Amino acid sequence: MKLLAILLVLPALCFGQRHEGPGMGPGMGPGMGPGMGPGMGPGMGPGMGPGMGPGQGQGQGQGQGQVGGSKCKGGWFLIGQQCFKMMSRALKWNDAELMCEQNAPCGTPVLGGVMTIPDIQTSNAVINHLKSLSSTAMAIDIPFWTGLHNKWNALLERYEGWKWPAGWSTTQQPLRFVNWAPREPNNQLLDQQHSYCARMNRMGQWYVVRCDEPMYFACSMPVSPPLVGGANTNPGMGMLVENPAPIINGYTEFESGLLMRNGVGGP
């Protein structure tokens, strides 16, 4: 009997603890595929979990609908060499990172993290995907976390440098792509007491802000198995090698009433 009880509990641990749960924030679009049964986390089917637009489905099915390819599962969709998952909560960066790790599909060899943007194509695709999920998206410039962060190391008494989440296999490569807004990164903000993270605006540009501000976010992880030459990261001191111009000229609006009530505003 004890062995049977253990076997029954293990699947629940795998599928239950890695999902947000129902009703955790405003919807931001229609569901993206039919649910596949009574799962324990939010699905991506109609009414089966928080969407990313006017759709407000609340439920606990674990949908298997997919966008951009079949290499991503459990509500994750493919952009380039990464699987993405849009989350419906505004969290501090560290809490967002933890939620991304917990939401990685079972059996994944690498951790998920707050979204990594290794190139201009990924940046464009992420913004276009946000726009496609709703007829109203981003006009009030709802900020989103990126995974880029610069943490203060109290032991070494220095900043660690701008880098992407540690779940990437190419962590030791330099930062080859940046899309900082004009006059960013603003090093005058760094006060040797707080860690700083990069948030993305509706144009895809990055701004330096303290990591303890709540913002909306998306998770990303390499396709499994990771492809060669995937992410560009930086464990060093954040030397910038390029700064592209703004990448999106048009935009649409978010459902501002719902989002603003969560304390997330523009730049």
Swiss-Prot record:
Residues 20-64 are annotated as: 11 X 4 AA tandem repeats of G-[PQ]-G-[MQ]. Residues 79-220 form the C-type lectin domain. The keyword Repeat applies. Sequence repeats lie at residues 21-24, 25-28, 29-32, 33-36, 37-40, 41-44, 45-48, 49-52, 53-56, 57-60, 61-64. Keywords: Disulfide bond, Repeat, Secreted, Signal. Expressed specifically in the micromere/primary mesenchyme cells (PMC) lineage. Produced uniformly and exclusively by PMCs through the early prism stage and this specificity is further restricted during skeletogenesis to a subpopulation of PMCs associated with the growing tips of the spicules. Its main location: secreted. It is found in: Secreted. Disulfide bonds join 100-219, 197-211. It comes from the Eukaryota. Residues 44-68 are annotated as: Disordered. GO terms for cellular component: extracellular region. The keyword Secreted applies. Residues 1-16 form the signal peptide. May play a role in the regulation or execution of skeletal growth. The repetitive domain may provide a calcite binding matrix. This is 27 kDa primary mesenchyme-specific spicule protein. It comes from Strongylocentrotus purpuratus (Purple sea urchin).
